Each structure stands twice: as C-alpha cells, then as structure tokens.
Amino acid sequence: RDSTWTTWYKNGNKKFLATYINGKLNGKYIRWYEGGIIKELDGDYLNNKKHNKWVSWAKNGQKTEEINYDNGVHHGSHINWYGDKNDQHKSFHVNYKNGAKDGDWHYWYASGVDSLKSNYLDGEKDGHWVWWRKNGLKDKEGFYKKEKKHGVWTIWNDSSGIAYHKLHEET
C-alpha cells in the first residue's frame, strides 16, 4: 500500500486518514469523532512508529493531551489537561529525553492547585522536589541526587504548619 487512505462513517463524515509508504504508516494520521468536525487524534508516523507531536481532543473539542515522540520513543514534553472548555488547566506537564524521564515534571490536582514539582536527569530522580496538599500548603520538600534523598528535607505537620527537618547524607 502506497497512498493516503481515508475511511468514512455511515453518515458520510470522515472517520480517519492515514498515509502509507511501502505498506507502513508514514506521514499524517488523523482520526475524527463521528460528527466529522472535531478531531479525536492527530499525529505523524515514521516507519509504523509514532513521530513528532501527537494531540488528542475530547468530544467537546477541548485538547486533552499532547505527546512528543522521536521514532516511537517519548522525546520532549507530554502534557495532559483537566476540565472543560470554561475551566481547563493542566493535569501534568512532564518531559522525556530518548524515552527516559528528564527535566522538570509538574503535576496539579483537579482543582488546579500544585501537587508535585520534581526533576529528573537521564531517568533518575535528581534535583529539587516539592509536594503540596490539596489545600495548597506544602507537604514536604527536598533534593534527590542520583535517585537518593540528599541534604536537608523539610516535612510540614498537617494541622499546626510546624515543620521538621531531616538530613540525608550521601552513602
């Protein structure tokens, strides 16, 4: 198969479009909801593997997810959203490098309040990490170095707001 294939719903609206070269998915791939106007999924393939940015939408047209690939491997940002069109905010925004967790990772509660900010380096916990409670108050904070807790960690008491500290030394 060497061509762009399009399929249709019974109502005449486009269902999906896919490009093939030498029998493999290569190029644009788009899938629509039955109404035919709102996309469900849009991305590219390279030799049957997801490539570049892939975007997903909900039936109401709201963008729900963006994922970046390099020849089938997570590479770059991956973002997911909560909510409806009137109150849309991120669920998470994370990063990959050649399939490994890398860089800033940020999660939010459904309310939009921060849940976790963290850092990775080549797939390992490395750098500053902060957790929050659903009410927006910090829960704990510290550093990782090559997957291990490092330095002073601060943990806050639920009710009094009083913090205590714990030192993690290199082993």
Where are these regions (language model features)?
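Glycine/tyrosine- and acidic-biased, solvent-exposed loop/turn segments at the edges of beta-strands
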Residues: 1-171
